[in-house]
UniProtKB/Swiss-Prot annotation:
It comes from the Bacteria. This is Post-translational flagellin modification protein B. GO terms for molecular function: N-acylneuraminate cytidylyltransferase activity. Required for biosynthesis of LAH modification in the post-translational modification of Campylobacter coli flagellin. Transmembrane segments: none annotated. Belongs to the CMP-NeuNAc synthase family.
């Protein structure tokens, strides 16, 4: 049976929304949603939290996350990319648990609107298509062929050229929602991008488009969770 590691990466120094990973939405800290969803999926023996914050670590432990290392400062800066953080968590986990994981599934702590069913279906898609890695996305509300623009040399131009006059006629585009990342071990260790020759895509519901990077994002996510009256059992 394959060994699947779940990682949840949550640093303490969030700038757009202060302490966002432990701010409460509907009586649950934001990071708690991802931990509960991971547990409810029944896919994981280990749910490992990568954080530089003692407060985040304490709260994660309360909900069943495993915290056995402190993320190093260079991996917790504003400029730190996420793939090295996930790679670090994988290697530390293999050393700690004395095993080798075949697959890593990362749940973004700032994207609490997924469900455990989303995690399961994304993993099933990954396995069925024999992908090296998989990303999640939602149908894009804006399209570079139609209504996204750039300013080049002082002139306003479409982001991508094309003679399209209706939204229905343009090629389908998707908006990465940063909710779920799945990697084969070797792909994660050997690549610094989520885009490869055999990258899979799992399309999620439009309501999962929001990951919390601003106060407006937080208010929208809070509204959606409260509007649906979502509780821990619902994930």
């Amino acid at each position: 049976m394959s060994e699947i590691l779940c990682t949840i990466c949550a640093r303490g120094g969030s700038k757009g929304v202060k302490n966002k990973n432990i701010r409460k939405i509907n009586d649950l800290e934001m990071i708690a949603y991802s931990i509960i969803q991971a547990k409810n999926s029944k896919l994981f023996k280990h749910i490992v939290i990568s954080t530089d914050s003692e407060e985040i670590a304490k709260i994660a432990l309360k909900y069943g996350g495993e915290v056995f290392f402190k993320r190093e400062a260079h991996l917790a800066s504003d400029t730190a990319a996420k793939i090295p953080v996930m790679r670090d968590a994988l290697l530390r986990s293999e050393e700690y648990f004395k095993c080798q994981f075949d697959t890593l599934i990362d749940l973004d702590a700032s994207a609490p609107l997924r469900s455990s069913a989303d995690i399961i279906k994304a993993f099933e898609t990954f396995c069925q298509n024999q992908n090296d890695n998989l990303i999640t996305a939602v149908p894009a509300r804006r399209n570079p062929y139609f209504n996204l623009i750039e300013v080049q040399d002082g002139k306003v131009v479409k982001s991508k050229s094309g003679n399209f006059t209706t939204r229905q006629s343009v090629p389908k585009c998707y908006d990465m929602n940063a909710s779920i990342y799945i990697f084969k071990r070797d792909f994660l260790l050997q690549n610094d991008s989520v885009f490869g020759k055999n990258t899979g895509l799992f399309i999620m519901d439009e309501s999962t488009a929001f990951d919390v990077d601003s106060e407006l994002d937080f208010k929208i996510v809070e509204f959606l969770i409260k509007e649906k009256n979502l509780q821990a059992k619902d994930f």
